[in-house]
């Protein structure tokens, strides 16, 4: 098995696990705007968008940051988050799965 194939399988598995957790899925997808593009948000904005408790959203954002699914940028004393390249690949897996489901 070549390295790219192994990497693709791991991304698909990660996407499936996130997709099975409603909170994790909502937090990750909050970073995608209505045009399907990645957007920058702070943790409070994510919590308000998806209407989940701040502690839950903050913990999920922190875990995604530690896992490398989102990137953090300091703006003054605040931190802004956006999808990393890995996070974008996971979202692409969600989109691909949705298209497959529509074609069934």
Curated annotation (Swiss-Prot):
InterPro entries: WH-like_DNA-bd_sf, WH_DNA-bd_sf
Keyword field: DNA-binding, Plasmid, Plasmid partition, Repressor, Transcription, Transcription regulation
Effect after changing residue 63 to W: Dimerizes, decreased DNA binding
Residue spans binding DNA: 43-50, 54-65
Variant or mutagenesis effect after changing residue 74 to A: No DNA binding
Induction, as annotated: Probably part of the tubR-tubZ operon.
Biological process, per Gene Ontology: plasmid partitioning
Gene3D superfamilies tied to this protein: Winged helix-like DNA-binding domain superfamily/Winged helix DNA-binding domain (1.10.10.10)
Top-rank lineage group of the source organism: Bacteria
Knockout or disruption consequences: Loss of plasmid replication. TubZ levels increase, TubZ still polymerizes.
Keyword S-adenosyl-L-methionine: no
Biotechnological applications: A miniplasmid containing this and downstream gene tubZ is able to replicate in B.thuringiensis subsp. israelensis and express insect toxin proteins. The miniplasmid could be used to make plasmids for insect toxin overexpression.
Outcome following mutation: residue 79 to A: Decreased DNA binding
GO molecular function: DNA binding; identical protein binding
Its biological purpose: A DNA-binding protein that is part of the type III plasmid partition system used to ensure correct segregation of the pBtoxis plasmid. Cooperatively binds to the centromere-like site (tubC), which may seed filament formation by the TubZ polymerizing GTPase, stabilizing TubZ filaments. TubR-tubC complexes track the depolymerizing minus end of the filament, probably pulling plasmid within the cell. Required for plasmid replication. Negatively regulates levels of TubZ; its effect on RNA expression has not been shown.
Subunit structure: Homodimer. Binds to tubC DNA, the TubR-DNA complex binds to TubZ.
Comment block on domains: Although this has the same function as TubR of B.cereus strain ATCC 10987 there is little sequence homology and the dimerization interface is different.
Further comment found in the protein's record: The pBtoxis plasmid encodes all the major endotoxin proteins (Cyt1Aa, Cry4Aa, Cry4Ba, and Cry11Aa) responsible for the mosquito larvicidal activity of strain 4Q2.
Full protein name: DNA-binding transcriptional repressor TubR
Biological source species: Bacillus thuringiensis subsp. israelensis
Record lineage: Bacteria, Bacillati, Bacillota, Bacilli, Bacillales
Gene (UniProt): tubR
